[in-house]
């Protein structure tokens, strides 16, 4: 399945960062890669329509991001297959189909969590992609939708998509999704987590590779889940408190390495930032992903405030970051 990382015998899917709309863009992924060399990264969801009809380059990424997966949103097998071929040609390591996002704009486009109600269509989509690419095609989904939340429903979905779609890897968000009445944010918080159900799913489908997602806030929790699952996917915590990634290579992958130093990570971003600024990017679009880096460290609040107040100003460059670092370094 997933290609193994160069410096570890353990596969990259053992620990991954969730695809998060408006968050895990290419700037964010470049930054996260500096914290962990081995974590599997995912793009934001990109719709097939955007790739096929959009004017921008929705498949852009930096070579340094590997291993990196493209998450696709769509429900037309032919369009998904076309986009999967494009992504493989660009060098992506995996294609992931979004069958978990419950937002209204996703449902209106007939993709995301609403697809859970049509397992055969999901199977057709996965099979169409698998037929045209050699990289893994995976599915990220929930444990149920609306009142279709029995364990039997979940098993039927997995059985159909793995059997007829030939999907070999699933990422399971351990909550069900309400397709109406809750916002995407509420759907990440209100439906209760049911980790034991996901563990049971892995036991009942031992031949499939499965990662668990939802509410995981520490590496200790991740290691507990790994007693039952093949992989762990962390979402909001990794974005809001990215410092937890500094120890992932050592603690999760068993690498003989020192943990990433956050100050060194900031300075390692400078060449990338300077290159992006020279191509028309705005500093604030990059530094917004770095605000939580020093969480729990004296000076963290001053770091966030200084970047928030200065990164958007005309002509802002790496000098803003260097000045912000002084507010943290002086307290270390």
Swiss-Prot record:
Cofactor list: FMN
Residues that coordinate or bind FMN: 19-21, 71, 140, 173, 213-215, 235-236
Site, as annotated: Interacts with tRNA: 98, 185, 188, 301, 304
One Gene Ontology MF term: FMN binding
EC category: oxidoreductase
EC identifiers of the protein: 1.3.1.-, 1.3.1.91
Catalytic activity: 5,6-dihydrouridine(20) in tRNA + NADP(+) = uridine(20) in tRNA + NADPH + H(+); 5,6-dihydrouridine(20) in tRNA + NAD(+) = uridine(20) in tRNA + NADH + H(+); 5,6-dihydrouridine(20a) in tRNA + NADP(+) = uridine(20a) in tRNA + NADPH + H(+); 5,6-dihydrouridine(20a) in tRNA + NAD(+) = uridine(20a) in tRNA + NADH + H(+)
One Pfam match: Dus
CDD domains, sorted: DUS_like_FMN
Record: active site: 101 (proton donor)
NCBIfam families per record: PRK11815.1, yjbN
Chain's role: Catalyzes the synthesis of 5,6-dihydrouridine (D), a modified base found in the D-loop of most tRNAs, via the reduction of the C5-C6 double bond in target uridines. Specifically modifies U20 and U20a in tRNAs.
Entry protein name: tRNA-dihydrouridine(20/20a) synthase
Native species: Salmonella typhimurium (strain LT2 / SGSC1412 / ATCC 700720)
Species lineage: Bacteria, Pseudomonadati, Pseudomonadota, Gammaproteobacteria, Enterobacterales
Gene assigned in the entry: dusA
